[in-house]
Amino acid sequence: MTPAAERRPLLPFGYARAHSVMLLSSGESCEVFCLAVTAPQALLEARRVAAMPFRLERLEEEAFEKLLVLSYQRDSAEARRMMADIGNELDLYTLAEELPDTDDLLDSEDDAPIIRLINAMLTEAIKEKASDIHIETYERHLQIRFRVDGVLREILRPQRRLAALLISRIKVMASLDIAEKRIPQDGRMALRIGGRAVDVRVSTLPSSYGERVVLRLLDKNSVNLDLLTLGMTPALLRQVDGLIARPHGIVLVTGPTGSGKSTTLYAALSRLDARERNIMTIEDPIEYELEGIGQTQVNAKVDMTFARGLRAILRQDPDVVLVGEIRDGETAQIAVQASLTGHLVLSTLHTNSALGAISRLQDMGVEPFLLSTSLLAVMSQRLVRRLCPHCRQQEPANADTAHQMEIAPGTALWQPRGCAECGFTGYRGRTGIHELLLVDDRVRMAIHRGENEVTLIQQLGTDYMTLRRAGREKALAGITSWQEVLRVTEQPIAEAC
């Protein structure tokens, strides 16, 4: 028998899976694999496509599934070529309306309709500047949603029976196991959409009515690594420049997933002169490639963890080290030791506030006296939607809003309205709001004494720029709305007590 690696499937994946029949060609000969329940009509179709004598073999269901996975994952090159450079001429909504019934798709001679639908979906997502595509399977419908400017909105509801075929094709493209539906899977693919280089991270998750898929889009052409245009004020930028010029210590950026932490760190690195410093990173994954910087990716399959990668980097004579995320006590301990031995360490933490990073590191086992010595600053950030400049309108602040913002009632505030330019959302694009905790002598002594967040923020006083106060400044400037600031920030601890 010819090895599976040398055989090419001749039937479209959808047909092979639906009818439990595979036709594999090695060039000079063909083999047909089926199940005991395979219909005679499917075998006749295989014979028609083969157009030559072939060997027929019936397999058990488990063996058939394994061969199906192996054969069509190796054949994904053709689909990759079809998606290698997606043009701009595809219209998602027209394609969805013109898509034939699912049964016709399964019986079609190629998988082009499904691939075209996926192409159109990706093209539309890039056009809308979406960060994520959600493909969600429910009992009676299939739903596709885009996350645009941090908010999900429904885009399309294709036929419910299309779910399995659509998700299976995405799995093939991401080199995932198409037969495995019981466990989550993660993969990625690199595409060109309208001439733009786009990395797509794929995550699947079993649910009660079928699999859910989330595609995270990383559009390398749209990356802005300018801290000013990312929303920093000139005064804050001067403080950040001073921090990254320090020879050693730890600088942390905190916030939830999708708040722009990695982009901020990349932008900070881009302000350093890589010709005079050895700058190295350990990331999961490498999101953007920076010239002159040594970037290493975490690989759990070979036990290449953040901690292990960081240890190796420290033997490479680095000046500046970026650790994608401090996830555990081991990584935290190594980062602290690195900062105490002459290295500048930049990293991220998942905490809700800058002050929360201190207690999080202590919970990970970092001793207060080491933390107070090594930590230079913590910056917490959020992304807020920008008001659409074409339709925003001014309204006087009511009493509740004025009280929350500590302004006079009736003060004019800009509000979202909605127009064709912003998709009738009232917002277009996003900007950052930032809270920077500089570890000065006062904060250093408080950390050393083990004081909690409430005590710390009370000591910092009203001059301390919390996230909500930073958002207030942007709302007063008409950059965003106060409702948007409330959506992404929490009430400062001192005010909540």
Swiss-Prot record:
It catalyses: ATP + H2O + cellular proteinSide 1 = ADP + phosphate + cellular proteinSide 2. This is Type II secretion system protein E. The gene is pulE. The lineage of its organism: Bacteria, Pseudomonadati, Pseudomonadota, Gammaproteobacteria, Enterobacterales. Zn(2+) binds at residues 388, 391, 419, 422. Keywords: ATP-binding, Cell inner membrane, Cell membrane, Membrane, Metal-binding, Nucleotide-binding, Protein transport, Translocase, Transport, Zinc. Gene3D superfamilies: 3.30.450.90, P-loop containing nucleotide triphosphate hydrolases, Type II secretion system, protein E, N-terminal domain. It is an enzyme of class 7 (translocase). It is found in: Cell inner membrane. PROSITE patterns: T2SP_E.
